[in-house]
């Protein structure tokens, strides 16, 4: 039986891509969606769909959480810009006790591989190496530093703490740029006295983010994910283990 999927932010750039993808999806039905300009109420979208995908704005996401806490449904959240909003994060955590909640600022496979390689590199390059993260996006992107860049910094800090303990807290330089129509570039550099090691990911189109959402959507349906808080990294991990340790 096909699952009905509702898009929150369905008139945005990502919403438009996902709308087209879901219309031809073999296992999903494109249900009612929501945008700030639509006549449909957000509560109505939640009630009439089996799974929700949210690419909206922080204030919309917070309202969505309030509704889902009353009527829990699995949700995939790609909205960015609320990394410092503990209220939304607390609501995500509470909702995850009842249904699968998947949150990721960048759901592309390439972004996952970059974070994985960055964490590995952070354990190999000690405190004698400086760390820098550069991120560039289109001029209309609101949040800076990007959620993806912040997740890279978190991966570095976590990896270094696991490997070196509290004795080596990294100092990370972070820079963001908003120019042109660039979909997303993220570069992590480990710079030593005699060498520089760079891990770089560049998205050529938003299609790579849409493809990642569809991979995660398939996992929700095929693997019957239990209630819990997930990131795209967690869901991609089985693929990484299969490739690396096969």
Swiss-Prot record:
Keywords recorded for this protein, A-Z: Amino-acid biosynthesis, Cytoplasm, Diaminopimelate biosynthesis, Lysine biosynthesis, NAD, NADP, Oxidoreductase
Listed name of the protein: 4-hydroxy-tetrahydrodipicolinate reductase
Active site: 137, 141
Binding of NADP(+), residues: 36
GO cellular component terms attached to this protein's record: cytosol
EC nos: 1.17.1.8
HAMAP family named among the record's database cross-references: DapB (MF_00102)
């Amino acid at each position: 039986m096909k699952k009905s999927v509702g898009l929150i932010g369905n008139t945005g750039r990502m919403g438009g891509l996902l709308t087209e993808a879901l219309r031809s999806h073999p296992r999903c039905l494109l249900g009612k969606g929501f945008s700030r300009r639509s006549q449909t109420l957000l509560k109505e979208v939640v009630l009439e769909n089996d799974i929700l995908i949210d690419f909206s704005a922080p204030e919309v996401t917070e309202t969505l959480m309030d509704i889902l806490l009353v009527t829990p449904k699995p949700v995939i959240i790609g909205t960015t810009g609320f990394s410092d909003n503990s209220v939304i994060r607390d609501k995500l955590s509470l909702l995850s006790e009842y249904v699968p909640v998947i949150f990721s600022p960048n759901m592309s496979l390439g972004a996952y591989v970059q974070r994985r390689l960055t964490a590995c590199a952070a354990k190999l390059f000690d405190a004698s190496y400086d760390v820098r993260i550069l991120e560039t996006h289109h001029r209309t992107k609101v949040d800076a530093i990007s959620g993806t860049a912040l997740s890279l910094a978190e991966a570095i800090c976590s990896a270094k703490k696991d490997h070196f303990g509290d004795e080596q807290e990294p100092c990370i330089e972070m820079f963001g740029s908003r120019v042109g129509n660039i979909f997303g570039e993220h570069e992590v550099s480990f710079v030593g006295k005699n060498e520089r090691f760079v891990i770089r990911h560049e998205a050529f189109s938003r299609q790579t983010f849409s493809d990642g959402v569809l991979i995660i959507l398939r996992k929700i349906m095929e693997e019957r994910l239990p209630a819990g808080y997930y990131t795209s990294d967690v869901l991609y991990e089985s693929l990484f283990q299969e490739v690396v340790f096969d």
